[in-house]
C-alpha cells in the first residue's frame, strides 16, 4: 500500500494523521488533546456573546454547535480528506441526514446509485420521500444511465464506492465530471467509509462532499458510534447551523471525539494490515471449491480492478462472496466459524462477517434487493488485524465438507 507522502512542503499523510489540528504548546504541553466536557461557554461581555451567536466573532457558545475537542478532530479530518472544513456528528447517519436536510427542499430530486447501505436507503426511500423529495435510482457504473437520471430538479448526486455490500466501484472523477457539465450547482456526495482518506480522497477527484461513518475504520476498535462530513467551508457551516443544530441534533460527545483522534493516529498502519489480510483472504476464497464468486477489487479477475488501480491507493479491507449452494450454504458456513465474529459493522481489529440480506440490508424488501443488486446468498467480510493465517484457517474449516 502506498500512503500519500509529503509534497510541496506538506507533511506526509501518516504524520498529519497524528499531528494535524493540534498543538500541545497551546494546551499546557499536553501531548494528547484535552476533553472539554462542557455544554456551554462563558462570555466576557454581552457584546462578545452577541457576536458569537451572529457569527461575526469566532468562538464557541454551545456544544450542540461546536466544542474545542471536536474542532481538533474536524480540522484533522478536513486536512486528511483535503477539504476546507469538516463537521463531526454522533453517527454516520447523523452526518448523512444533517447534510441532506440542509441541501434539499420539497420538490427537489436526489439521484442515487442503485445500491446503498441499508439505513441510507431507508432514509432516502422512507424518510425524504415523506417530505416531498424525489429519489431517483440509477446504475452509476453505467454512465449513460446515470446521466439520463439528471434533471432540472436534481440537487444532490449521492453514492458509495466501493458499494456496500456488493463491492461495485463507481468512477468518482467520471461521475463528478458528468454532473458538473450538466449543472455546477448539483452537489456530488461520496460515502468514503470503506476506503477512508488513506486509500481514496473523493474531493480531489471532483466530489463536493464526503461523508463517513467514523464508527468504522476511523475509530477502528468497535467502541464508538460517530460520523463526519467534509467539504467546502461554506457548505459545512450551513450543515452545522441547520442540519446539525436545528434538524437532527446529532451531536458528538467529546469523549467519542477523543477516541476517534486516537484511532486516526494509527489509521495508516491499520489500513495497511486490513488491505494485506483482505488480499490474501480474497485470493484463497477465489480458489476455494465451495465459493462461487468473490467480489474484491484487488483480484485481477474483478471487473473493477482497473478502476481501483486508478482511483484507490490500495484495495481495502472489505470482501463479498457468494457460496455454491446460496443462502443455505452461507448460513452453514457462518454458523461454523470459531475465530471470525458474526457481527455487523466493519473496520474493527476483529474480522467480522455478516449476511446483508438478513442483517444490514434487511430494510430492503426481497424485490428491492433483487432490483438493487443484493443477492440472498451474499456474505460480507471485514478483514481484521489478526494473523491472516488464522483467519484463513477459520474460513477453510467453516467451508469444509
Locate each region found by the language model.
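N-terminal glycine-rich, Lys/His-bearing helix-loop that initiates the first secondary-structure elements
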Residues: 1-57
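PLP-dependent enzyme catalytic core of the Aspartate aminotransferase-like
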Residues: 2-3, 125, 134-136, 155, ...
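Acidic-histidine catalytic/liganding microenvironments
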Residues: 80, 285-289, 337
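Conserved C-terminal alpha-helix-loop-beta "cap" of PLP-dependent enzymes
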Residues: 293-379, 383
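Glycine-rich beta-alpha junction loops
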Residues: 22-24, 37-43, 194-196, 216, ...
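Conserved N-terminal alpha-helix of the aminotransferase class I/II PLP-enzyme fold
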Residues: 45-94, 124-126
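Conserved PLP-enzyme active-site core in the AAT-like
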Residues: 6-9, 17-26, 85-290, 295
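Short amphipathic alpha-helical segments
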Residues: 58, 84, 225, 256, ...
Amino acid at each position: 500500500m502506498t500512503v500519500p507522502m509529503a509534497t510541496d512542503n506538506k507533511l506526509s499523510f501518516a504524520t498529519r494523521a497524528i499531528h494535524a489540528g493540534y498543538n500541545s504548546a497551546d494546551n499546557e504541553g499536553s501531548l494528547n488533546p484535552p476533553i472539554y466536557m462542557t455544554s456551554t461557554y462563558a462570555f466576557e461581555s454581552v457584546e462578545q456573546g452577541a457576536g458569537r451567536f451572529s457569527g461575526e466573532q469566532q468562538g464557541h457558545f454551545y456544544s450542540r454547535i461546536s466544542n474545542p475537542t471536536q474542532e481538533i478532530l474536524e480540522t484533522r479530518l478536513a486536512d486528511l480528506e483535503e477539504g476546507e472544513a469538516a463537521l463531526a456528528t454522533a453517527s454516520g447517519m447523523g452526518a448523512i441526514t444533517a447534510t441532506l436536510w440542509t441541501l434539499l427542499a420539497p420538490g427537489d430530486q436526489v439521484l442515487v446509485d442503485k445500491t446503498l447501505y441499508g439505513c441510507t436507503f431507508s432514509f432516502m426511500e422512507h424518510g425524504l420521500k415523506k417530505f416531498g423529495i424525489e429519489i431517483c435510482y440509477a446504475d452509476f457504473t453505467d454512465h449513460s444511465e446515470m446521466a439520463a437520471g439528471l434533471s432540472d430538479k436534481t440537487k444532490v448526486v449521492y453514492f458509495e464506492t466501493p458499494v456496500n455490500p456488493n463491492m461495485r466501484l463507481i468512477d468518482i472523477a467520471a461521475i463528478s465530471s458528468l454532473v458538473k457539465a450538466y449543472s455546477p450547482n448539483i452537489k456530488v456526495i461520496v460515502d468514503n467509509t470503506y476506503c477512508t482518506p488513506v486509500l481514496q480522497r473523493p474531493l480531489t477527484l471532483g466530489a463536493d462532499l464526503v461523508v463517513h461513518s467514523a464508527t468504522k475504520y476511523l475509530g477502528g476498535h468497535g467502541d464508538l458510534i460517530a460520523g463526519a462530513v467534509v467539504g467546502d467551508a461554506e457548505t459545512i457551516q450551513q450543515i452545522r447551523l441547520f442540519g446539525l443544530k436545528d434538524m437532527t441534533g446529532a451531536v458528538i460527545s467529546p469523549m467519542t471525539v477523543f477516541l476517534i483522534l486516537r484511532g486516526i493516529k494509527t489509521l495508516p498502519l491499520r489500513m495497511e494490515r486490513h488491505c494485506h489480510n483482505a488480499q490474501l483472504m480474497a485470493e484463497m476464497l477465489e480458489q476455494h471449491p465451495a465459493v462461487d464468486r468473490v467480489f474484491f477489487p484487488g483480484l485481477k479477475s474483478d471487473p473493477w480492478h482497473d478502476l481501483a488501480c486508478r482511483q484507490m491507493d490500495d484495495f481495502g479491507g472489505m470482501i463479498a462472496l457468494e457460496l455454491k449452494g446460496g443462502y443455505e450454504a452461507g448460513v452453514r458456513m457462518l454458523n461454523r466459524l470459531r475465530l471470525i465474529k458474526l457481527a455487523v459493522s466493519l473496520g474493527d481489529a476483529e474480522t467480522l462477517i455478516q449476511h446483508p440480506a438478513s442483517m444490514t440490508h434487511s430494510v430492503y424488501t426481497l424485490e428491492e434487493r433483487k432490483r438493487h443488486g443484493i443477492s440472498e446468498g451474499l456474505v460480507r467480510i471485514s478483514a481484521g488485524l489478526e494473523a491472516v493465517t488464522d483467519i484463513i484457517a477459520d474460513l477453510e474449516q467453516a467451508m469444509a465438507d
